Design a protein with these regions (language model features):
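Conserved ABC ATPase "signature" region
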Residues: 99, 103, 109-124
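Helix-to-loop junction immediately C-terminal to a conserved catalytic motif
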Residues: 52
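Walker A (P-loop) phosphate-binding loop of ABC-type ATPase nucleotide-binding domains
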Residues: 39-43
Length: 152
């Protein structure tokens, strides 16, 4: 049997008395395009944050390729994600932000210019991200998610 790329088993997250995710289980097979849909407040972002190790589940597990995200040696080489377009330091240029991401995940620096070109930010790559519009910030976030030749 092929190991799922993503798996959640009985994943639950509560905040105080509020249950944001309630015993969620699913698998995503390699090579499949999978949507994750639901109304506001359904727990989509919370689930993604648990998969990415940003929030600890109250119970259950979420794995990437059979491993907890926190156990991945170079996670950005396996997983690309964009949860918030505004987490870039406002005084860092788009290029330097991506260089930092590449360096900390053992990704060749040449990939930085490739993804800047993919998302149409080459002409503003040396500008401070704090001056970017929402759309430009979202494209920079997407560039970060695409930085590696990702599996997920």
């Amino acid at each position: 049997m092929v190991e799922p790329m993503l798996a959640a088993a009985d994943l639950t997250k509560t905040f105080g008395g509020v249950t944001a995710v309630d015993h969620l289980s699913f698998t995503v097979a390699p090579g499949r395009v999978t949507g994750f849909l639901g109304p506001n407040g359904a727990g989509k972002s919370t689930t993604m944050r648990m998969i990415l190790g940003l929030d600890r589940p109250t119970s259950g597990t979420a794995t990437v390729g059979g491993q907890l995200y926190r156990d991945l040696r170079h996670p950005l080489r396996q997983v690309g994600a964009l949860l918030d377009a505004h987490w870039v330091h406002p005084n860092r240029s788009a290029r330097n932000h991506l260089r930092w991401m590449a360096a900390t995940n053992d990704i060749p620096e040449r990939r930085v210019d490739e993804v800047l070109d993919m998302v149409g930010l080459t002409s503003v790559a040396n500008q401070r991200a704090g001056g970017f519009s929402l759309g430009m910030s979202q494209r920079l976030g997407l560039a970060g998610a695409l930085l590696s030749l990702i599996h997920i």
